[in-house]
Amino acid sequence: MKKLVIVGCGRLAGIVADAVVKGLLPDYDLVGVYSRTASKAAHIVHKMQQHGKHCIACATLEELLALKPDYLVESASPAAMRELALPALRNGTSVITLSIGALADETFYQEVTETAKANGTRIYIASGATGGFDVLRTASLMGNTTARFFNEKGPNGLKGTPVYDDSLQTEQRTVFSGSAAEAIRLFPTKVNVTVAASRASVGPENMQVSIQSTPGFVGDTQRVEIKN
């Protein structure tokens, strides 16, 4: 059995824990969790214990890594990803990241790539809302590649961001046009998927992103266009 741990114990971590409980990950044991909010970590531990599975809440990242996990699921934040990736990889632990926006930083991306290679570990990028990364990689390998990412959101999904104003409730508008690297800086929790698609193809600086706000729209529409 492979040992699995989680950093960040919110909704996404709960989905992973549920998958373990339901037997959807038969080759993995969830052995530990870590969250800066202790009550959230305790909630997941309690869920696992209710189903007869041993799991502990760790007080620090160091305590979590001392469990010698094979895989660490990062479901916390880009800042957490930047903090944990290198220690985990050096520990012999591969990282499955949901905060893909952290990898838009080219220096950090190169550092984690080199550290993973040096330690026989890997960084796994969760595809999230968009699939087809194998197609993007294949097209990119052919050379002379250009790629665009289109995202449609409802105005309520943009509240709290620099582009939001009340006129978006009644007016359809393109609220952002630029690179994936620029997009993740402006929307650090909204467009992780653009960085994921760019890392599978042309890179964050070269992936062009357009975000449209549509009144009354709920959810997200994603479209990736790639040409070579």
Identify the residue ranges that each predicted region occupies.
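A short helix->loop->beta-strand "cap" motif at the edges of active sites that frequently abuts
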Residues: K53-C55, N91-S94, A118-T121
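N-terminal Rossmann-like dinucleotide-binding module
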Residues: M1-Q49
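Short, ordered loop/turn segments at secondary-structure junctions
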Residues: R36-A38, I100-L103, A129
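Beta-loop-alpha module in the N-terminal Rossmann-like domain of NAD(P)-dependent dehydrogenases
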Residues: A59-R90, A102-D105
